């Protein structure tokens, strides 16, 4: 049994989120939540919500036991960027891309 949860368009770059995702890949969900709770990174809070959603999906839809669940797969894909401009000298402007990502978490036995 595998249950999935997806967060689309998270307003953080995929590169920063992958650092957190790599730390919890393959861990039991209780240890993964512990790691995410004490991580100082912004991405940890976002990933924690997705993991909790996947656990809730497994409980509600499949009747799974939380103690047996572990993180089967977690991956982070790049999403659309918001294009913005910032003012520069002599009336010029530079483009800034505000990155976003899609976070997918799969939990199972």
Curated annotation (Swiss-Prot):
It comes from the Bacteria. The lineage of its organism: Bacteria, Pseudomonadati, Pseudomonadota, Betaproteobacteria, Burkholderiales. CDD domains: Ribosomal_L22. It comes from Burkholderia multivorans (strain ATCC 17616 / 249). Gene3D superfamilies: Ribosomal protein L22/L17. This is Large ribosomal subunit protein uL22. GO terms for cellular component: cytosolic large ribosomal subunit. Part of the 50S ribosomal subunit. GO terms for molecular function: rRNA binding; structural constituent of ribosome. InterPro entries: Ribosomal_uL22 (IPR001063), Ribosomal_uL22_bac/chlpt-type (IPR005727), Ribosomal_uL22_bac/org-type (IPR047867), Ribosomal_uL22_CS (IPR018260), Ribosomal_uL22_sf (IPR036394). This protein binds specifically to 23S rRNA; its binding is stimulated by other ribosomal proteins, e.g. L4, L17, and L20. It is important during the early stages of 50S assembly. It makes multiple contacts with different domains of the 23S rRNA in the assembled 50S subunit and ribosome. GO terms for biological process: translation. The gene is rplV. NCBIfam families: rplV_bact. Belongs to the universal ribosomal protein uL22 family. Keywords: Ribonucleoprotein, Ribosomal protein, RNA-binding, rRNA-binding.
């Amino acid at each position: 049994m595998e249950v999935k949860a997806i967060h689309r368009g998270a307003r953080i770059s995929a590169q920063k989120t992958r650092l957190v995702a790599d730390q919890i890949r393959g861990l039991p969900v209780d240890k993964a939540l512990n790691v995410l709770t004490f991580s100082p990174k912004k991405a940890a809070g976002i990933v924690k919500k997705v993991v909790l959603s996947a656990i809730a999906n497994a409980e509600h839809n499949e009747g799974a036991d939380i103690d047996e669940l572990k993180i089967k797969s977690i991956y982070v894909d790049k999403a659309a960027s918001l294009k913005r401009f910032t003012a520069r000298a002599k009336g010029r402007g530079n483009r800034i891309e505000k990155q976003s990502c899609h976070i997918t978490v799969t939990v199972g036995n």
